[in-house]
Amino acid sequence: MEPWFQKEMELSKEIVKSAKDVSNKAIIFIGRTAGEDKDNQATEGGYYLTQDELSMIKEVTSVFEDVTIVLNVGNIIDMSFSVKYNDKIKSILYAWHGGMEGGNALADVLCGDVTPSGKLAGTIAKEISDYPSDSNFGDDRVNLYEEDIYVGYRYFETFKKDSVLYPFGYGLSYTTFESTVISSKVSDNEVVISVEVINTGSVKGKEVIQVYVSAP
């Protein structure tokens, strides 16, 4: 089965301009419906944005200087629009499929009641062809890992650093943090790292401490 999406209503310049009369900020929602056996396809309405969605982004960014994109999707989609309209799109939020409380959680973040603290659990590349799994994607008989052990961020870190648009572990916040390693201890069975985290911003928030290791 193919992934499906809700067709966007036609968005005229007049509608966008009338919205600008009541707010100086705009929020664009883009959605995808995915599930088992119909996660994604390299088509418009799947991995790629539709022409209606691209037109919507173009119209809104032509009027608004401060635009937020909310992606209500089940998987990473093409993010090239973030480069093209980088001067107007101030933030992009992957809301994923949040379940019955997803709407409340999203509203809390957008209204500033909660500071976002999530980090990307996958690497977002510039082009779909940059992913090593692209050539084997969609085979309904077998999952072929031609990239061997270089799955996900390992592949980009090793072979294609310049192809990364948003790296594994990336994420923005309404505040800023300063992290300092206090101590680290290595034994035969474990590694213990103590980190001091200081909120250097003006609002409360949470930070994800990320530790990366490699073979000696």
Label the predicted regions.
Residues 1-216:
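C-terminal non-catalytic regions of proteins with extracellular/luminal or membrane-system context
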